[in-house]
């Protein structure tokens, strides 16, 4: 999920106006890294998110398909969380990582802007790779990482015990909120115990810690190792669902490691097509997508590989651009989830179909009966000209 918008001109091959195969097309420079993987790529335009109010960002609404805004809590769960519920149980149902400037990642190592488990229940993104490494692999580490992990674990366990013991005297109006607070500590302590039980297995997947963790020269050093941690969590089976927020769902972001001096809100005030700055950012994104695919391709699963059973969704929390009304919300799919989705093609969705339709289609692919995702019939009369799954993207 890249912030600042995803202009269609940065992903649609020149001259392509109607739905067709990508086989004989040349991908635009920003996504040229995906050229060898065209047969697994599906470029989609024509979906809309007008109802999400995505001008600076739809925030939780980008993955929830509802109106979102800065500082406004989620009004319902998001597609990534619902997927994590539908897929087989894992040690950590859902992992979110967020990439930003070094300063922002250090001062705010966790933020919640994109994912939610329900109304008023945001899911936080991890932005400090040192903290995330300790969480996932601290129990199998040595030296200072192990010491920090044990100290943190002891502290969290003690806080959890104290919190659980002290809540009984609170007024009824505060008990639910306090219960969620206590539940957070129980979740963290429970995860640590579950990870500890499979420590031998995890040793095969833990990334090597290097200077980029403790002494990053640029923010992209942390972006790269966060990606490594996310990939390792998929390969090891720690989680089945990974959400990556590049820009963390806000209007900020920095890529000085790519030679880009401009950062933050100004990046959204420029045209992306044929813009050297955005070519670099989108190429960096595309290289990350390639790395995910290649890593998952290396893991046997069933009669094929993990990538054969994976669907990667690439889009923006700003639809097509900053200050947009969300009338066109471009999406790229990579992989076909064992033949469920079409690939190797470009599709322009006709009519008035919201991003919710894509999300309900994805849920159906994992066995969840869902005609409309987070959209009432009353809302659908205004924002959806069809019903049911998005047939144009199904094989």
Give the residues covered by each predicted segment.
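Ligand-binding pockets and gating/stacking loops
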Residues: 1-395
């Amino acid at each position: 999920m890249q912030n600042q918008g995803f202009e269609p001109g940065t992903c649609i091959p020149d001259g392509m106006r109607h739905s067709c195969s990508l086989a004989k097309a040349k991908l635009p420079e920003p996504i040229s890294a995906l050229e060898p993987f065209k047969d697994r790529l599906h470029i989609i335009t024509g979906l809309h998110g007008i109802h999400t109010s995505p001008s600076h960002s739809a925030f939780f609404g980008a993955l929830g398909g509802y109106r979102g805004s800065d500082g406004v809590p989620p009004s319902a769960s998001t597609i990534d969380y619902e997927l994590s519920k539908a897929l087989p149980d894992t040690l950590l149902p859902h992992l979110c990582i967020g990439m930003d400037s070094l300063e922002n990642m250090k001062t705010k190592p966790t933020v919640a802007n994109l994912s939610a488990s329900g109304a008023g229940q945001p899911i936080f993104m991890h932005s400090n790779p040192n903290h995330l490494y300790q969480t996932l692999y601290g129990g199998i580490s040595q030296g200072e990482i192990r010491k920090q992990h044990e100290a943190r674990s002891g502290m969290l366990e003690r806080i959890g015990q104290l919190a659980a013991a002290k809540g009984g005297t609170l007024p009824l109006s505060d008990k639910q909120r306090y219960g969620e607070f206590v539940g957070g500590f129980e979740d963290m302590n429970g995860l640590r115990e579950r990870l500890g039980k499979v420590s031998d297995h995890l040793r095969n997947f833990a990334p090597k810690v290097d200077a980029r963790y403790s002494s990053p020269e640029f923010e992209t050093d942390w972006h790269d190792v966060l990606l490594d941690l996310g990939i390792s969590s998929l390969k090891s089976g720690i989680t089945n669902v990974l959400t990556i927020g590049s820009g963390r769902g806000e209007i900020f972001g920095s890529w000085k490691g790519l030679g880009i001096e401009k950062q933050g809100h100004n990046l959204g005030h420029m045209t992306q097509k044929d813009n050297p700055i955005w070519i670099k950012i989108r190429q960096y994104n595309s290289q990350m997508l390639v790395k995910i695919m290649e890593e998952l391709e290396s893991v046997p699963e069933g009669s094929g590989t993990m990538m054969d059973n994976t669907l990667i969704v690439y889009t923006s929390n700003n639809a097509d651009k900053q200050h947009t009304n969300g009338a066109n919300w471009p999406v790229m799919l990579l992989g076909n989830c064992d033949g469920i989705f079409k690939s190797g093609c470009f599709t322009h969705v006709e009519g008035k179909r919201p991003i919710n339709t894509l999300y309900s289609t994805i849920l159906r692919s994992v066995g969840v009966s869902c005609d409309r995702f987070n959209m009432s019939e009353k809302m659908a009369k205004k924002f959806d000209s069809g019903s049911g799954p998005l047939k144009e993207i199904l094989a």
